[in-house]
Amino acid sequence: MSQPVAITDGIYWVGAVDWNIRYFHGPAFSTHRGTTYNAYLIVDDKTALVDTVYEPFKEELIAKLKQIKDPVKLDYLVVNHTESDHAGAFPAIMELCPDAHVLCTQRAFDSLKAHYSHIDFNYTIVKTGTSVSLGKRSLTFIEAPMLHWPDSMFTYVPEEALLLPNDAFGQHIATSVRFDDQVDAGLIMDEAAKYYANILMPFSNLITKKLDEIQKINLAIKTIAPSHGIIWRKDPGRIIEAYARWAEGQGKAKAVIAYDTMWLSTEKMAHALMDGLVAGGCEVKLFKLSVSDRNDVIKEILDARAVLVGSPTINNDILPVVSPLLDDLVGLRPKNKVGLAFGAYGWGGGAQKILEERLKAAKIELIAEPGPTVQWVPRGEDLQRCYELGRKIAARIAD
């Protein structure tokens, strides 16, 4: 079990590290590097715990609290978000500290009562601008609905310029250290991008508005302590700037080709498209979906300007392994992307129309409709067309 970690004098990380989790939100999100469930204790004249942990790790949380002060006494329990990975230990904490006063949004209170109807607790509904004094420090709250649940809010400690934004600015990564200056910067940003792309992308417009709101009130931020992953203390501006880019849909001259194949015909088309894109000066990421992690593909789509999806026809439909990516894209609604559908068929088609309909449903602009299709096997002229389309797309998305 890891130990409490001081963020500054009197403020501690008291969360838990989950080294073994490999899927999150059921099977929806791959977590190859594990995750953390971050909770924070603020000790002043009064003591506040900001968020809890996933229920299986409740004893770790309680043990850390006892290392700081035993017996544990909490004046406040701040619930930024009621999802089980953050509020799963709510019953255990309320049993340990039944007099703790819960601070949360109205939507969070409604969710807590739905999840834990058997627990009675004292509470105050907070809104943006509500402030609670702990002594030398205070807590100020900023509602953040749909980032990423309706109940979500940020907690801010103005005296320390410390932002506790729950799921915002987080990453799914398990580490033995807690801060951004202790972990490879590229690794952290890669996991932060994957987190944003797969969880927060549908809420990009709201994120832009929230970042603008924070800027308008001139919120000083020295440290960002999210509820998953590392704490940003060296360069919190880096992740804020990244969120601003991602939320606006800023991309680069990059294309993602995601496909699968039965007897290599669609694969040959994918490679010809890639050759054209590369010849046009474009960065390319190529994924055969049956051997690729869908969440990693979506992470690469985040900063790409073009998305090319290929499938042969099977039973007048697309390959089953291709469908989940398209389903995700429809829900995630990536911004400012152009796309192309391609594939092979035998005696009857069908996949091409489905691919194009799904890409359009994801608000991806088709650069050619219909895209390239071939019967049975691609010939030289078919591959040349794919190559030329690749060059055309590269020119379209060039910097």
Curated annotation (Swiss-Prot):
List of residues binding Fe cation 1: 81, 83, 148, 167
Alphabetized UniProt keyword annotations: Electron transport, Flavoprotein, FMN, Iron, Metal-binding, Oxidoreductase, Transport
Gene that this sequence comes from: fprA
Record keyword Electron transport present: yes
Protein name: Nitric oxide reductase
Cofactor(s) in the UniProt record: FMN; Fe cation
Inducers of expression: Constitutively expressed.
Record-listed Fe cation 2 binding positions: 85, 167, 228
Cofactor comment text: Binds 1 FMN per subunit.
Stretches for region Zinc metallo-hydrolase: 32-221
Enzyme class: oxidoreductase
The keyword Iron is annotated on this UniProt entry: yes
InterPro entries given in the database record: Flavodoxin/NO_synth, Flavoprotein-like_sf, Metallo-B-lactamas, ODP_dom, RibonucZ/Hydroxyglut_hydro, Rubredoxin-O_OxRdtase
Molecular function GO terms recorded: electron transfer activity; FMN binding; metal ion binding; oxidoreductase activity, acting on NAD(P)H
Highest taxon above the source species: Bacteria
